[in-house]
């Protein structure tokens, strides 16, 4: 039960991601995904969402995969994948998915046992509903409409009403309920009705958690949604402008370090592939072992621009 995650340090090996569905809306990698990273639904993930979440605590990046499966050569397959810079407040490009249908990061919305045990959850909580319309409200950047009659856009935030009595519930559930009063919960995917998401932990009392299902939707209120974006009014703007992408040397012996430099404006984050992955700043050192074409991916809320150097 729940969506698992793994924490790695900055020395975790980078591996390639092979995209099977939404590659054009994904970050290209490589990504530091361990061969034994837990998949949502393990040990029998079946045909579920198969999310894989990786926190790089050395470089402060979050990597999330949807529809993930590992390969014997260490690479991974994924329907989609996104990297999140934990040192900045970024968003996916408008109309782009992430590893979640709303285009949001998954991990920040999960309920973790350690938070509950500490007595305080300080963030909104991820939840699902069976149906949604083809619309989104910030912070969502993507929709997955499956109903023309549903009034619910991706990114909708519900808040537990202030007068809801939490005292009949256990101390742990009161922590969750108080967070729902203060921060609310954000619609992030189509799924089970009013389903809150958390991380697996043997310390959870699942019987106690099931008591949350007694709470009716009428106990919540919708936080004002403005603006609501549909296909007719998606925000428009310019993707990043890359003015240069160069290498310090164009011909070197195998294994010799080369510095890639770039100048760009308007980018929220960068990914250099192959070999590098997500990176901050305007330069990075690489050590090619053969003739290699490097691609700079510069992304903001309006799209992605690329440049190459060989």
Question: What label would you give each PLM region?
Answer:
Residues 277-295, 301-302:
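Solvent-exposed segments in extracellular or luminal domains encompassing
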Residues 238-247:
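Proline-enriched interdomain boundary motifs that mark the N-terminal boundary
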Residues 1-237:
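Short, surface-exposed polybasic-aromatic patches that bind anionic ligands, especially phosphate groups
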Residues 250-256:
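Short, solvent-exposed loop/linker segments at the N-terminal edge
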Residues 263-269:
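Short proline/glycine-enriched turn/loop motifs at strand-loop junctions of beta-rich domains
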Residues 305-310:
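C-terminal edge beta-strand
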Residues 272-274:
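Conserved aromatic beta-strand anchor motif in extracellular beta-sandwich/beta-rich domains
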């Amino acid at each position: 039960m729940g969506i698992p995650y793994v924490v790695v340090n900055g020395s975790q090996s980078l591996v390639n991601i092979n995209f099977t569905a939404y590659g054009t809306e994904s970050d290209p990698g490589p990504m530091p995904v361990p061969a034994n990273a837990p998949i949502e639904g393990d040990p029998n993930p079946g045909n579920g969402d198969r999310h894989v979440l990786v926190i790089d605590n050395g470089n402060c990046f979050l990597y999330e995969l949807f529809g993930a499966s590992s390969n014997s050569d260490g690479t991974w397959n994924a329907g989609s994948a996104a990297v999140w810079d934990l040192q900045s407040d970024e968003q996916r490009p408008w109309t782009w998915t992430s590893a979640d249908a709303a285009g949001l990061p998954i991990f920040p919305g999960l309920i973790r046992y350690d938070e509950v045990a500490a007595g305080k959850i300080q963030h909104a909580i991820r939840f699902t509903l069976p149906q949604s319309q083809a619309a989104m409200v910030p912070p969502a950047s993507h929709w997955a409409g499956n109903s023309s009659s549903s009034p619910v856009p991706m990114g909708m935030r519900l808040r537990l009403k202030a007068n809801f009595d939490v005292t009949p519930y256990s101390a742990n559930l009161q922590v969750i309920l108080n967070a729902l009063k203060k921060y609310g919960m954000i619609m992030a995917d189509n799924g089970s009705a009013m389903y809150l998401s958390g991380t697996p932990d043997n310390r959870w009392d699942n019987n106690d958690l099931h008591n949350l299902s007694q709470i009716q939707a009428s106990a919540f209120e919708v936080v004002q949604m403005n603006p609501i974006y549909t296909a007719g009014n998606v925000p428009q703007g310019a993707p990043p402008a890359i003015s240069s992408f160069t290498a310090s040397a164009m011909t070197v012996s195998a294994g010799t370090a080369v510095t890639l430099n770039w100048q760009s404006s308007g980018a929220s984050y960068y990914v250099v592939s192959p070999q590098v992955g997500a990176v901050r700043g305007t330069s990075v050192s690489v050590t090619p072992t053969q003739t290699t074409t490097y691609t700079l991916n510069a992304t903001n809320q309006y799209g992605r621009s690329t440049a190459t150097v060989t």
